[in-house]
């Protein structure tokens, strides 16, 4: 069920894949997808020891099973944003290659298309179905990663996505999907992350489960205490952090706190309850 615009709830009409390709695994097909996020024109997915990205759009003009595409075909879609200028596409179970994109045409087009590649069979495709790219590896070596959590932020005019997995160094992606690790020892292994008052807050490290670390203003990777970074300790194991209005709420196993203020000089912890907690934030 989903919320109804007229009030209450309504039954969902169904669902379909947003990306047709299966997320690759690292070493075992039993590995679960442990994180998914939408960032810019891409979809981010985390599985095994790696993080991947892919692009998705919808078909604007139907394709018949008999349409000939042998290097000069076109596929008309809502948008080519996020797709490479040449590459591979998948519609349902059929795969295509293309050699160009036309973002000036309305709707957009993939050009130089060849269909039924990689031993797939030409089939009819109706409008509004998913057109997607293969998954591209954007980060590796994330050994024993658990559930991913994400934070989108913009401190310097550039949109970024920060990912934590509870084990490895947090990783930051810009819109070009270039990865930068946050390697400060106290931050590596953080399970929770939130941007609050232009500081990046990290928590959930297994060796310091009661500790909240925060960066200097407008820099998610600088923890110099003299420049506005610091730590805050609560008297319980942190299970989640979340910004709501002008406060950062800190959920613990048996307690809930909120952080107010705007900088290291006036940050203050206020208890909300000491009798109700949150086992898994």
Located regions from the model:
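Small/polar beta-strand repeat architecture
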Residues: 58-70, 78-147
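Short coil/turn segments at the loop-to-beta-strand junctions that recur within blades
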Residues: 141-147, 185-190, 273-279
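Short glycine-/Asp-/Thr-/Trp-enriched loop segments that recur within the blades
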Residues: 28-30, 144-145, 231-235, 275-281
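Hydrophobic or amphipathic alpha-helical targeting/insertion segments
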Residues: 149-185
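Short coil turn/linker residues within repeat-based beta-strand modules
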Residues: 58, 177, 219, 263-264
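N-terminal beta-propeller domains
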Residues: 1-57, 135, 170-172, 186-258
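Inter-blade boundary loops/turns of WD-repeat beta-propellers
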Residues: 54-57, 101-103, 166, 175, ...
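Blade-edge beta-strand/turn elements of extracellular beta-propeller
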Residues: 182, 259-275
């Amino acid at each position: 069920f989903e919320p109804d615009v007229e009030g209450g709830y309504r039954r969902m009409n169904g669902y379909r894949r947003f990306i047709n390709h299966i997320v690759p695994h690292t070493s075992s097909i039993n590995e679960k997808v442990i994180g998914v996020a939408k960032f810019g024109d891409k979809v981010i997915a985390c599985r095994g020891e790696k993080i991947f990205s892919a692009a998705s759009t919808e078909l604007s003009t139907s394709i018949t099973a008999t349409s000939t595409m042998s290097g000069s075909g076109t596929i008309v879609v809502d948008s080519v944003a996020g797709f490479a200028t040449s590459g591979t596409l998948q519609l349902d179970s059929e795969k295509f290659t293309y050699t160009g994109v036309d973002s000036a045409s309305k709707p957009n087009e993939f050009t130089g298309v060849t269909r039924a590649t990689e031993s797939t069979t030409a089939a009819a495709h109706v409008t509004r179905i998913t057109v997607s790219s293969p998954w591209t590896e954007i980060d590796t070596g994330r050994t024993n990663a658990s559930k991913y959590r994400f934070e989108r932020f913009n401190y310097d005019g550039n949109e970024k996505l920060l990912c934590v997995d509870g084990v490895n160094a947090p990783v930051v992606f810009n819109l070009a999907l270039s990865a930068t690790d946050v390697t400060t020892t106290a931050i590596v292994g953080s399970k929770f992350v939130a941007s609050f008052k232009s500081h990046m807050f990290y928590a959930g490290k297994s060796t310091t489960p009661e500790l909240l670390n925060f960066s200097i203003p407008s820099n998610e990777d600088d923890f110099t205490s003299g420049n506005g970074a610091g730590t805050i300790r609560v008297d319980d194991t942190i299970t989640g952090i979340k910004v709501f209005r002008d406060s950062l709420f800190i959920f613990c196993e048996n307690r809930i706190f909120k952080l107010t203020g705007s900088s290291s000089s006036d940050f203050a912890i206020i208890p909300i309850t000491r009798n109700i907690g949150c086992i898994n934030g």
